[in-house]
Amino acid sequence: MKALSKQESRAGIWMVDTEVPRPGPNDLLIRVKKGSICGTDVHIYKWDEWAQKTIPVPMVVGHEYVGVVAAMGSEVRGFNVGDRVSGEGHVTCGHCRNCRAGRRHLCRNTLGVGVNRPGSFAEYLVLPAFNAFKLPDDIPDDVAAIFDPFGNAVHTALSFDLVGEDVLVTGAGPIGVMAAAVARHVGARNVVITDINDYRLDLARKMGVTRAVNVTKEDLWSVARNELGMTEGFDVGLEMSGSGPAFAQMVDVMNNGGKIALLGIPSGDVRIDWNAVIFKMLTIKGIYGREMFETWYKMAALIQSGLDLRPIITHHFGIDDFQQGFDAMLSGQSGKVILDWEKR
């Protein structure tokens, strides 16, 4: 089969021929239809410090996809050949304290599809059946292909009550924009998103945010106070950028008793005003991945109740043009980029 693999310890991704993997007794063999390029894949492509420490070479990469069940292990129940599926990319151990307590998203022994085990940028993927999510018929393939990052957005956005609240999202990458759209969909009063990339702020506007702010050109607090009538600060903060200055600004503009969910990963140490955290009595919660599988059920329900993610998908390429897809991601002038394994 064809696959995209990190073949060498340098920048780049390579198309290779490799054997079709064999499912174990508890696994599904999934024929991949479409995949999406994640920021993690870009880190691996660029071979940055994190990738060098984390990724064994060679490794088939990718973890955002939609496909159909091609074969099943002998012990698999609840699936049929031909079922349309996506899947949870965090493969957990099942025997640690958190797994046994039903908190699998907190497993200390998690392996990542396309990171520590073979990924979904391939014609076929083997995945534990436990990790597969059977897709409703009314969720289109393009949207299903981005369910993994959508799950990050949903997990982050729904960490706190949003109904009637003023929400600040820092970072207008695809996950940040989707988190902002979730907040609007479930009833937040104002949803403000900040970034320094005008292209992605325009995507956020298309997804329905109340206000998109380029912090190099406008003052965030002036916009909130003078345009939106906010006098006390934001109630909920969703930090999606990994930017130290963005996080510091978020802490500064939160209302007393505000709640912050952190998904963005900083590249180094970040300084914030801990006195503000204490005296404002802020709650800060770290987010990683998706809750298994509560987040997945909520994702499907949000789409089925009318949340439209299609504007965040900006590019489509046949798999033979994968390099163009990575170039689009690297440019910063894209939303989600779809690679189609059925289009050569």
Swiss-Prot record:
Q: What is its main location?
A: cytoplasm
Q: Which residues does the Swiss-Prot or TrEMBL record annotate as the active site?
A: T40 (charge relay system), H43 (charge relay system)
Protein keywords: Cytoplasm, Metal-binding, NAD, Oxidoreductase, Zinc
Entry's Gene Ontology molecular function annotations: L-threonine 3-dehydrogenase activity; zinc ion binding
Which residues make up the annotated site Important for catalytic activity for the proton relay mechanism but does not participate directly in the coordination of zinc atom? D148
Q: Which cofactor does it need?
A: Zn(2+)
Residues noted as binding NAD(+) in the record, renumbered to the chain: I175, D195, R200, L263, G264, I265, I287, Y288
Q: Which Pfam families does the record associate with it?
A: ADH_N (PF08240), ADH_zinc_N (PF00107)
Quote the SUPFAM superfamilies the UniProt record gives: GroES-like (SSF50129), NAD(P)-binding Rossmann-fold domains (SSF51735)
Q: Residues that bind Zn(2+) 1, according to the entry?
A: C38, H63, E64
Gene Ontology biological process terms from the UniProt entry: L-threonine catabolic process to glycine
Q: Which InterPro entries match?
A: ADH-like_C (IPR013149), ADH-like_N (IPR013154), ADH_Zn_CS (IPR002328), GroES-like_sf (IPR011032), L-Threonine_3-DHase (IPR004627), NAD(P)-bd_dom_sf (IPR036291), PKS_ER (IPR020843), Zn_alcohol_dh (IPR050129)
Reaction(s) catalysed by this chain's protein: L-threonine + NAD(+) = (2S)-2-amino-3-oxobutanoate + NADH + H(+)
Q: Where in the cell is it found?
A: Cytoplasm
Instruction: Report the cofactor remark.
Output: Binds 2 Zn(2+) ions per subunit.
What positions does the entry give for Zn(2+) 2 binding? C93, C96, C99, C107
GO terms for CC? cytoplasm
EC code = 1.1.1.103
What this protein is reported to do is described as: Catalyzes the NAD(+)-dependent oxidation of L-threonine to 2-amino-3-ketobutyrate.
HAMAP family in the record, alphabetically?
Answer: Thr_dehydrog
The family note in this entry says: Belongs to the zinc-containing alcohol dehydrogenase family.
Self-association state and partner proteins as the record states: Homotetramer.
Which protein are we looking at?
L-threonine 3-dehydrogenase
Source organism: Deinococcus deserti (strain DSM 17065 / CIP 109153 / LMG 22923 / VCD115)
